[in-house]
Amino acid sequence: MDLFKFFSKQSSKDVAKERLKLILIQDRNSISPDVLESIREDMLKVISKYIEIDNEDVDIKMSSVEEIEGMSPALIASIPIKRIKKK
């Protein structure tokens, strides 16, 4: 693992390539941005019942993961936790 590469910024070419991949994945899975936003809102509402989260830094996107049969769609969520709520 190259530690210097880990801390370096992505080039605009790499960012554009990653965005295009995400658009293609969303298109192939027939999930519109509106539906993805609805999923995001619903997930955050449920999670917020139990955990205090940082809504500003939430990142939810469609991706793909390699399965035995090939590539499968995946919903990837990065949700920063501030603290666990007590009942």
From Swiss-Prot:
Gene3D superfamilies to which the protein is assigned, alphabetical: Cell division topological specificity factor MinE
GO biological processes: division septum site selection; regulation of division septum assembly
Similarity annotation: Belongs to the MinE family.
Any single Pfam family the record assigns to this protein: MinE
Protein name as annotated: Cell division topological specificity factor
Keyword Cell cycle among UniProt keywords: yes
Function: Prevents the cell division inhibition by proteins MinC and MinD at internal division sites while permitting inhibition at polar sites. This ensures cell division at the proper site by restricting the formation of a division septum at the midpoint of the long axis of the cell.
